[in-house]
Amino acid sequence: MAVKIKLTRLGKIRNPQYRIVVADARTRRDGRSIEVIGRYHPKEEPSLIELNSERAQYWLGVGAQPTEPVLQLLKITGDWQKFKGLPGAEGTLKVKEPKPSKLDLFNAALAEAEGGPSNEATQPKKKKAPAKKAASDIEATADPAGNADKSEPAAEGEDATVAGATEG
């Protein structure tokens, strides 16, 4: 029986994801497989290539033929060089940088905050309008005895007569 190592397609329309499988050469692309030995996601950056190297070496050793795309993946991971006894068995696989854990991020932020808690405002204070301050100073100097209460109703009355004159 002729055995091939090939890709079976999974995923959405524009987001292909593949399984690297060992299957009979006569089966269709997504047909029954003998064994799944890895996966390949070409749309990720860098492309995700996971391959069980031990099982790939076994199947290559018993005569399984890789298809062209799988052969390229085997060369990237270094399994083809290892099988053939060529130099460069470490491969050229790019590895995605691991994400920092949330605990590490939290500890870093905590250390930064302890380093110098600032009492300064993030935005400068807005200055009050000088007209209000000047008006309150004038009232305080004009009537220090507290007669300001008597003068206010008179001012209100004047405003009322002026408003009444304009209405009529």
From Swiss-Prot:
Gene Ontology annotations for the cellular component aspect, listed alphabetically: cytoplasm; small ribosomal subunit
Domain of life: Bacteria
Region (Disordered), start-end ranges: 110-168
Disulfide bonds: none
The entry's keywords: Ribonucleoprotein, Ribosomal protein
MF-aspect GO terms: structural constituent of ribosome
GO biological-process terms attached to the record: translation
Family: Belongs to the bacterial ribosomal protein bS16 family.
Protein name in the entry: Small ribosomal subunit protein bS16
Organism: Mycobacterium sp. (strain KMS)
